[in-house]
Swiss-Prot record:
The keyword Thylakoid does not apply. It comes from Pseudotsuga menziesii. It comes from the Eukaryota. This is Non-symbiotic hemoglobin. Signal peptide: none annotated. Keywords: Heme, Iron, Metal-binding.
Length: 9
């Protein structure tokens, strides 16, 4: 989870 888009998926 970051701001809007989770770039960990």
């Amino acid at each position: 989870v970051f701001e809007i888009a989770p770039s960990a998926k």
